[in-house]
């Protein structure tokens, strides 16, 4: 059997889709999988068993689909984890026998992990037994970037792909790092031009204070990003893809929420995570930039609140 899967676009969504993907894998143990999607989503599942990885060409996706129809031949089942109309066209071009499409308007108030699981359960008329986040990477827990002085590692992730509204202030991240700098060395994570500026700002603030810090922005692959986050003793992050990676590895995490719904995208089943957010009337707006122009959901969320939650995590030895 040959199964085509159109993965979610974003890193975090793809992580949250992992229980659903492994549910399909469990149900069709001997199937061959074609995993199709963005660079980050396909990189995340590059080592998925018995699979062929195809990166979507967004500039000519329909022409690509026509070529794939000839290359792949008969496809028995296809699942689109995207609700975009383009995904429907692609699966139509491939002429899959049975096609199933994720509907983002179903189960609107459920966590995103459950939305994806219900999609597969309803499509295949099965009950999912696997509900844990899982990635196919086999990580080596010997980090080549360890700062080698006996200190623990604090990871900072100041970026977020959805838009600037999700990003906590760089100076706030730096203040948190300064608070823990006696006991932790600092790793800064990020990707892309906008995040590079944030990461550089934090890096400069810390270097001026003679804090030991490594800026890994745009210096990791998806696999080494997973490796480094898994190695952290504490992780401070916005609502983002790396936040969901930290949930996979049960890293002690303080997750900062502003405009997004933490009930739907919180770190899934990570008992080592604490959520920090305000309760403003305008939250959650779900906008890329603040429509009210004040961005109070993030600006009024002061570093002291994050520091307090981080200290609570660290002092609870059972975590």
Curated annotation (Swiss-Prot):
Q: Cross-referenced InterPro entries, in alphabetical order?
A: Glyco_trans_9, LPS_LOS_Heptosyltrfase, RfaF
Keywords from the named record: Glycosyltransferase, Transferase
Q: Which reaction does it catalyse?
A: an L-alpha-D-Hep-(1->5)-[alpha-Kdo-(2->4)]-alpha-Kdo-(2->6)-lipid A + ADP-L-glycero-beta-D-manno-heptose = an L-alpha-D-Hep-(1->3)-L-alpha-D-Hep-(1->5)-[alpha-Kdo-(2->4)]-alpha-Kdo-(2->6)-lipid A + ADP + H(+)
* Transcription as UniProt keyword: no
Provide the function of this protein.
Glycosyltransferase involved in the biosynthesis of the core oligosaccharide region of lipooligosaccharide (LOS). Catalyzes the addition of the second heptose unit to the heptosyl-Kdo2-lipid A module.
NCBIfam families linked? heptsyl_trn_II
What's the name of the protein?
A: Lipooligosaccharide heptosyltransferase 2
EC number per UniProt? 2.4.99.24
GO CC terms: cytosol
A further note on this protein reads: Can complement a S.typhimurium mutant lacking waaF.
Species lineage = Bacteria, Pseudomonadati, Campylobacterota, Epsilonproteobacteria, Campylobacterales
Source organism, top-level taxon: Bacteria
What does the record note as the disruption phenotype of the gene behind this chain?
Mutant synthesizes a truncated LOS molecule.
């Amino acid at each position: 059997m040959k199964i085509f899967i159109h993965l979610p676009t974003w890193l975090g969504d793809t992580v949250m889709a992992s229980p659903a993907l492994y549910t399909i894998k469990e149900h069709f143990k001997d199937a061959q999988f074609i995993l199709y999607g963005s660079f980050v989503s396909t990189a995340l599942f590059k080592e998925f068993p018995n699979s062929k990885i195809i990166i979507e060409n967004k500039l000519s996706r329909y022409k690509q689909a026509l070529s794939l129809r000839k290359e792949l031949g008969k496809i028995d089942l296809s699942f689109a984890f995207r609700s975009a109309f383009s995904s429907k066209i692609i699966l139509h071009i491939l002429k899959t026998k049975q096609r199933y499409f994720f509907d983002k308007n179903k189960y609107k108030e459920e966590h995103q992990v459950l939305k994806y699981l219900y999609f597969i359960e309803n499509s295949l008329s099965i009950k999912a037994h696997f509900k844990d986040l899982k990635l196919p990477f086999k990580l080596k827990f010997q980090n080549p970037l360890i700062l080698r002085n006996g200190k623990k590692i604090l990871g900072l992730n100041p970026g977020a792909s959805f838009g600037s509204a999700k990003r906590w202030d760089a100076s706030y991240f730096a203040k948190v790092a300064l608070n823990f700098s006696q006991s932790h060395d600092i790793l800064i994570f990020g990707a892309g031009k906008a995040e590079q500026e944030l990461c550089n700002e934090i890096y400069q603030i810390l270097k001026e204070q003679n804090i030991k810090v490594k800026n890994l922005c745009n210096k990791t692959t998806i696999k080494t990003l997973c490796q480094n986050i898994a190695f952290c003793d504490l992780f401070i992050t916005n609502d983002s893809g790396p936040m969901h990676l930290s949930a996979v590895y049960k890293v002690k995490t303080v997750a900062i929420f502003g405009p997004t719904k933490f009930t739907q995208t919180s770190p899934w089943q990570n008992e080592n995570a604490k959520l920090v957010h305000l309760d403003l009337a305008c939250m959650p707006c779900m906008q890329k930039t603040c429509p009210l122009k004040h961005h109070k959901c993030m600006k009024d969320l002061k570093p002291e609140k994050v520091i307090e939650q981080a200290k609570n995590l660290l002092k609870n030895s059972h975590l």
